[in-house]
Design a protein with these regions (language model features):
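An intracellular "coupling" helix at the cytosolic face of ABC transporter transmembrane type-1 domains
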Residues: 27-30, 47, 71-76
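Pre-NBD coupling/linker segments of ABC/ABC-like ATPases
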Residues: 47-58
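Conserved E/DxxT/N motif and adjacent residues on the DHp alpha2 helix
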Residues: 40, 47, 160
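Cytosolic ends of transmembrane helices, especially the final helix of ABC transmembrane type-1 domains
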Residues: 13-41
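Membrane-water interface of transmembrane alpha-helices in multipass transporters/channels
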Residues: 1-9
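ABC-type nucleotide-binding domain
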Residues: 56-308
Length: 308
């Protein structure tokens, strides 16, 4: 009986060892494939380069799309953007609205040259974006995304990613425009409050407002808000837009939003559908002439009435 028990014990130990060895081989195979993908990322060269004689000055915040079409890959069958002909004046406030997958974000990513247009030309300040020094262009085109990042460090340190040389007064002013100063001032340590990695110790709306303030510190010619007030209540959202109209009128402001309330007071609103411009106009003009905008507005206001 003892010999049988010993045999079973040793057999079980051998079986476990064989299983662990097989798991090691599986992990080695997975690690090898992961290593290949990491190496591909590290060795991938940029397809965007500075021209031989780059332009180092962005004259103003005007933006022109001249018959622009774009797709993310040359192998792609369908254009993400098609036949975009759009002219934005410097200092103008532009709203962009449309359904999911209508390429709203793709449109604005061409302005800061995160991608190059497949066809046509994109100009900023009257100059083709391909002719600019990349760093110069991107310093003058500030983008705030819906899920922007805060880093571990104090609020001051996070804000100074927008401008390392910003004074304390400039930090406070930017936060006031972004409607962030009020809640920051309520923290025991104020602007020296420590932010956890990813901003986990502040709410989504507070994080978005701090990211907007950080972008404002760059003093850009063009400010792009890509659904970056989605976690902010409508009253605060309106106060942010009001402050921008009053204090940075010379800055071109492009607001991508899901809520019509976020773009109603824009100088012009662009309605996107299927990678194309479906309509352009003021809120009143689109309510009269654009079915897509009217449907979005009606559905959101019906939902608001039901919630009330």
């Amino acid at each position: 009986m003892g010999q049988l028990s010993a045999l079973l014990t040793y057999s079980f130990m051998i079986l476990m060892s064989l299983m662990m060895i097989s798991m090691v081989f599986v992990m080695i195979t997975m690690a090898e494939e992961s290593g290949k993908r990491i190496a591909e990322v590290l060795t991938e060269g940029s397809t965007l380069h500075n021209p031989e004689n780059p332009v180092y000055d962005v004259k103003d915040g005007s933006v022109d799309f001249d018959q622009v079409s774009f797709k993310y890959s040359q192998a792609a069958e369908r254009m993400a953007l098609a036949d975009i002909d759009l002219h934005i004046r410097s200092g103008e406030t532009i709203g962009i609205i449309g359904g999911t997958g209508s390429s709203k974000s793709s449109l604005v990513q061409l302005i800061s040259r995160l991608y190059d247009a497949t066809e046509g030309r994109v100009r900023v300040g009257g100059v083709d974006v391909k002719d600019y020094d990349l760093e110069t262009l991107r310093n003058q085109v500030a983008m705030v995304l819906q899920k922007n990042v805060l880093f571990s460090g104090t609020i001051k340190e996070n804000l100074r990613w927008g401008s390392e040389s910003a004074t304390d007064e400039e930090l406070v002013h930017a936060c006031k425009l972004a409607q962030a100063d009020e809640f920051v001032s309520q923290f025991p340590d104020g602007y020296d409050t420590y932010i956890e990695q990813g901003g986990t110790n502040v709410s989504g709306g507070q994080k978005q407002r701090l990211c907007i303030a950080r972008a404002l510190l760059k003093k850009p010619k063009i400010l792009i808000l890509d659904d970056s007030t989605s976690a902010v209540d409508t009253k605060t959202d309106a106060l942010i837009r009001k402050a921008m109209r009053e204090f940075i009128p010379e800055t071109t402001k492009i607001i991508i939003a899901q809520r019509t309330a976020s773009v109603e007071d824009a100088d012009r609103i662009i309605v996107m559908e299927g990678g194309r411009i479906n309509g352009i106009g003021t809120h009143r003009e689109l309510m009269e002439n654009n079915e897509i905008y009217r449907e979005i507005y009606t559905s959101q206001n019906k939902a608001g009435d039901q919630d009330a």
